[in-house]
C-alpha cells in the first residue's frame, strides 16, 4: 500500500484538543488506501468564520459546517498525485461530538475519513450512495478501532 502525504494547516487560534498530524495521516491513509505511489492532500483546520464563508461561497449554505471537501481536478494529460483539500471546522466538530456523545478523537477521525472518501468521489446525495458511503465509513472507522459513527442513527 502507498502512503498519503498530508499538508496540515492549522488556521484556528485554539489548538487544544486537536488531533496530531500523525493521527490525521493514519486516518486519511485508512480512508484513501492508496495503491503504490504516494498521494497528497491538504487538511486545513479552521474556525467557524472561515468554514461559514467557504460553505456559503461553494455550497450556498449560510452556516459553518463540519467538513468541506475540494477534490483536485487535474487535466487528463497531467499526472499529479494530488487528491484535493479538506477543510474541517474545529468548533463544529467539537460541538457535534458533544451533542452526539462521541469521543472527540473519534469524531475527528470520522471527519477525515468522510472527507477523504469525498475526495475519492463518494457522495451521499442519493439514498443508495449514502448507504454505500456510510457502510464504507463504518468499516474504515472500525478498522481504526472506533465505533460505528452512525450507531446513534440506527
UniProtKB/Swiss-Prot annotation:
MF-aspect GO terms: metalloendopeptidase activity; RNA endonuclease activity; zinc ion binding
Keyword Ligase: no
The protein's Enzyme Commission number: 3.1.-.-
GO process annotations (BP): rRNA processing
Major place of residence: cytoplasm
Alphabetized UniProt keyword annotations: Cytoplasm, Endonuclease, Hydrolase, Metal-binding, Nuclease, Ribosome biogenesis, rRNA processing, Zinc
Location(s), subcellular: Cytoplasm
InterPro entries: MetalPrtase_cat_dom_sf_prd, YbeY, YbeY_CS
Gene3D superfamilies: Metalloproteases ('zincins'), catalytic domain (3.40.390.30)
Cofactor binding remark: Binds 1 zinc ion.
Pfam families: YbeY
A GO CC term attached to the entry: cytoplasm
Cofactor(s) it depends on: Zn(2+)
Residues annotated to bind Zn(2+): 114, 118, 124
Purpose: Single strand-specific metallo-endoribonuclease involved in late-stage 70S ribosome quality control and in maturation of the 3' terminus of the 16S rRNA.
Family recorded in the similarity comment: Belongs to the endoribonuclease YbeY family.
PANTHER family: ENDORIBONUCLEASE YBEY, CHLOROPLASTIC (PTHR46986:SF1)
Name the record gives this protein: Endoribonuclease YbeY
Source organism of this protein record: Haemophilus influenzae (strain PittEE)
Record lineage: Bacteria, Pseudomonadati, Pseudomonadota, Gammaproteobacteria, Pasteurellales
Amino acid at each position: 500500500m502507498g502512503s498519503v502525504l498530508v499538508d496540515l494547516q492549522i488556521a484556528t487560534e485554539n489548538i487544544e484538543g486537536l488531533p496530531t498530524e500523525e493521527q490525521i495521516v493514519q486516518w486519511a491513509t485508512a480512508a484513501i488506501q492508496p495503491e503504490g505511489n504516494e498521494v497528497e492532500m491538504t487538511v486545513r483546520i479552521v474556525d467557524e468564520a472561515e468554514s461559514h464563508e467557504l460553505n456559503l461561497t461553494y455550497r450556498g449554505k449560510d452556516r459553518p459546517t463540519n467538513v468541506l471537501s475540494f477534490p483536485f481536478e487535474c487535466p487528463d494529460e497531467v499526472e499529479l498525485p494530488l487528491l484535493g483539500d479538506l477543510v474541517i471546522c474545529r468548533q463544529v466538530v467539537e460541538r457535534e461530538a458533544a451533542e452526539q456523545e462521541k469521543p472527540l478523537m473519534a469524531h475527528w477521525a470520522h471527519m477525515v475519513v468522510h472527507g477523504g472518501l469525498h475526495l475519492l468521489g463518494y457522495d451521499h446525495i442519493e439514498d443508495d450512495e449514502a448507504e454505500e458511503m456510510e457502510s464504507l465509513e463504518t468499516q474504515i472507522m472500525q478498522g481504526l478501532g472506533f465505533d460505528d459513527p452512525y450507531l446513534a442513527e440506527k
